[in-house]
Amino acid sequence: MADQLRTLPKNAKVIYEHCLKQIPNSLSQQDLVEAIGASISVNDLSSALNILLSRRLLDPLRQGNVLVYRAVRLDEAKTVSTMEGDEQIVYSFIKNSGNEGIWRKTLTLRTNLHVSVVDRCLKSLESKNLVKSIKSVKNPTRKIYMLYDLVPSTELTGGPWFTDQELDVEFIENLKKVIYRYVHSKSFPPKKAAMGPDLVWGPEYNGYPTALQIHNWLRSTNITKVDLSLANVISLVDVLIYDGKVEKRSDGASYRAIRVNNENIDAFTESPCGNCPVSDICDANSRVNPITCEYLDKWLN
């Protein structure tokens, strides 16, 4: 394949080398004119592009209504050159789907090939470790195809919260507990028996953690082997906020834990009846009774 590069006309070689540097980005003909300059005429540029396309060193793509070109590495071009025509078509559509992949049914519709031909091509490409099939957490019955060496998008895998296409509730709950304990440790002074458990920091305290600090702390402790992104950590803190365990401070960046009351609450004392001064004469057959009690009615509603 290196011989093919050496035998390229000068203009085609210049264009190809420039496109290689832009991978994974694509370039329009106008982009090439602006990058290479006036050294190549429009006619020579078109001829060079046709040569590169014929040797499968460029992939033609569309971005809206604009035709663009993306370089194909030499080793991949060599692999593609050994494929049959139908295989090349199927491979091209799978490649262009990126890490979002493409559903087998969609692939059949877009290639306009018979389903048996598509299946044969897929089987061949999988046997060569050029493409792979994965399952989507949103549509577990669908087979999604993408290039073999690509990492599926979180839209397909569900990100770190899913294991084998199942929501890992235990993993999420354990991480929430760990993060809450960390935020709590930064939100209140150490307990001192003589001063009681409800100590708080003064207004000058600036040790409340940000999402980035929580993220860095998680990574430094190796609590989990799963590589969590900053966005993942923020989503967990948001859940803790909804749970009423953490609040975002007025600075908009740091977080403070909310003390959780773990004492057992007597449901009777929480109701109006537990504090009613005439509860001893309240009776279903009395003038003071639960049916006509406006306080109990409001509390129940």
Swiss-Prot record:
- Subcellular location field: Nucleus
- Organism, scientific name: Schizosaccharomyces pombe (strain 972 / ATCC 24843) (Fission yeast)
- The organism's lineage? Eukaryota, Fungi, Dikarya, Ascomycota, Taphrinomycotina
| Function per UniProt | DNA-dependent RNA polymerase catalyzes the transcription of DNA into RNA using the four ribonucleoside triphosphates as substrates. Specific peripheric component of RNA polymerase III which synthesizes small RNAs, such as 5S rRNA and tRNAs.
Swiss-Prot/TrEMBL GO biological process terms? transcription by RNA polymerase III
Keywords linked to the UniProt accession: DNA-directed RNA polymerase, Nucleus, Transcription
Q: Write out the GO cellular component annotations.
A: cytosol; nucleus; RNA polymerase III complex
Write down the SUPFAM superfamilies for this protein, in alphabetical order: Winged helix' DNA-binding domain (SSF46785)
The record's similarity note reads: Belongs to the eukaryotic RPC34/RPC39 RNA polymerase subunit family.
Name the InterPro entries on file.
RNA_pol_Rpc34, RNA_pol_Rpc34-like, WH-like_DNA-bd_sf, WH_DNA-bd_sf
One Pfam assignment: RNA_pol_Rpc34
GO MF assignments: DNA-directed RNA polymerase activity
Q: Partners and quaternary state?
A: Component of the RNA polymerase III (Pol III) complex consisting of 17 subunits. Interacts with TFIIB.
This protein is called Probable DNA-directed RNA polymerase III subunit rpc6
What main location does UniProt list?
nucleus
